[in-house]
Amino acid sequence: GFQTLVFTVSVDSIAMMPCNPNIGGSSKGHLVREIDALGGQMGINIDKTFIQSKMLNKSKGPAVHSLRAQADKVNYSMEMRKTLQNTEHLTIRQAEVAEIITVPANSADGETAAVEKKDGQMVEINGELQKITGVKTVSGGVYHCKAVVLCTGTYLRARCLTGEMITYTGPNGLMAANHLTDSLKAHGIEMQRF
């Protein structure tokens, strides 16, 4: 496989589960099976760390039966972290990515640029074809690459509301990613809260 670098604001937040740590069920069970079919680890790790599992909708027909497992959320996170740490060609780095680095494409012929754009190495930013060349961290580190995959979760300019009080933090008191949003907006990507 490709040499891959995973950035995380905290190594302790890898595969951190929410307050209701379920995997599977009626709405998401098919997603777990799709991830499993593609070689993913979600199903494997829940098999190692579940504390209870239940077949839902048993009183209905087999088409709607659905397995849901309740995870030991601490062990699930530790198992997933071990899995990533032992994956060949994968390096984990604890740092906050602040910027996506791009350069103008400057392709001699539009046909080549269109092919590269289709392959994911070019991106149109504010009407101009750009090539992604890397990322820059808050501490100033620059990491060159051929592709960037963003999985921001709930961390971009995260804030927790406790009554009237607003705390600018990620889940469970972890650091929020406060800088990447500006870079994404500068590249013409709209931000929305759901």
Question: What are these model-derived regions, one by one?
Answer:
Residues 2-103, 111, 139, 151-171, ...:
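Conserved N-terminal/central alpha/beta ligand/cofactor-binding core
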